[in-house]
A protein has these predicted regions:
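Extreme N-terminal starter segment of soluble prokaryotic enzymes
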Residues: 2-5
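Active-site rim helix/loop that mediates acceptor-substrate recognition in acyltransferases
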Residues: 13, 21-67, 165-189
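Conserved beta-strand in the GNAT
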Residues: 47, 53-63, 74-81, 195-204, ...
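Conserved acetyl-CoA-binding loop-helix of GNAT-fold acetyltransferases
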Residues: 82, 88-101, 216-227
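Conserved GNAT acetyl-CoA-binding A-motif
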Residues: 96, 101-115, 229-238
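Conserved active-site tyrosine of GNAT-family acetyltransferases
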Residues: 120, 125
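Active-site/acyl-donor-binding loops of N-acyltransferases
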Residues: 126-142, 212-219, 223-291
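Amide-forming acyltransferase catalytic core, primarily the GNAT-like/NAT-type
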Residues: 127-219
Length: 291
């Protein structure tokens, strides 16, 4: 099957969204509207065409990370999707290969994505950030702190202080935080803070799942959320000691990284290879975004 790989035009953006919704039907009820309006753009989309029809697409979203005392320009690879009837014809592989070549030429330091070791390892991706998973029953919560709905400005202040202890975290702006808050509102989720930490969460059958937690002291916030919602599940960067007697339930490989210009990626880090960088020897690695 001979495919044409190219960037889409603005007039093809709607078709890229249609491909996304077919491949990720769980997003079609609302998330994709938000994602295509606020998280991606036509210029980020690389697509595969067969006989003039868009059959697959990939989003390479700018993703600056804090590393080596500065900011390294990377991309987050998201939404790698192929229409079901065209799978197993190497469309995704051709998209990833073309994307890497283009980004390497642009001087992009690395590509980062949500893990799928069995697929992405073949393209040069290695594990980057790991998170420990925890469960906190409401009965084990501590002393609650007064909480409030957070703002983008407050989130950025907390995030900036929190990220100083890690390497590899996204260099976020207040606008980024506004976009995350908009996503939470659109999806009926919650964003709370006690001034020391913030949490983005959604309700579950048992309580709530916190999908982003940042802050040096999370005890008061977690206690208040457990009192409000019930049992909590949340994640912390690997080897972080939780501030409450939460039960560790496992670990998750949270992101993978592929060096595209390794000299740029490693500059001023002390590491000689990306594997060394990811090992944690030159700083604790943390990422919070899936895409």
């Amino acid at each position: 099957m001979e495919l044409t790989i190219r960037h889409i035009g603005a007039d093809e953006y709607g078709e890229a969204k249609r491909v996304w919704n077919i491949c990720f039907p769980e997003d079609a009820s609302g998330y994709s509207d938000y994602y295509f309006a606020r998280r991606t753009m036509a210029e980020y989309v690389l697509a595969a065409f067969y006989e003039g029809k868009m059959i697959a697409a990939l989003h390479a979203i700018p993703y600056p990370i804090m590393l080596g005392g500065g900011t390294k320009n990377c991309v987050m690879i998201a939404g790698v999707a192929t229409l079901p009837e065209y799978r197993h014809h190497m469309a995704a592989a051709q998209l990833i290969t073309a994307c890497h070549a283009e980004q390497k030429q642009k001087g992009t330091a690395a590509a980062i994505l949500k893990p799928d070791v069995n697929f992405y390892e073949q393209f040069g991706y290695i594990p980057f950030a790991w998170h420990d998973e925890y469960r906190l029953p409401w009965i084990d919560a501590g002393i609650p702190a007064p909480i409030h709905e957070t703002t983008a400005e407050e989130m950025l202040k907390i995030y900036s202080a929190f990220s100083a202890d890690y390497i590899g975290m996204m260099a976020r702006t207040e606008q980024d935080m506004e976009i995350y808050l908009e996503g939470a509102r659109r999806l009926g989720e919650y964003a709370y803070s006690d001034g020391k930490a913030y949490a983005l969460l959604n309700e579950t059958d048992y309580g709530a799942d916190i999908y982003e937690l940042a802050g040096a002291d999370t005890a008061g916030l977690l206690s208040s959320l457990a009192e409000e919602f019930g049992a909590l599940t949340f994640r912390l960067p690997r080897d972080t000691i939780p501030s409450l007697p939460a039960m560790r339930t496992g670990e998750i490989m949270f992101s993978m990284i592929c060096p595209l210009n390794e000299d740029i990626l490693l500059e001023n880090t002390g590491a000689q290879t990306t594997e060394e960088l990811a090992s944690g020897e030159y700083g604790r690695v943390c990422t919070l975004e899936f895409c």
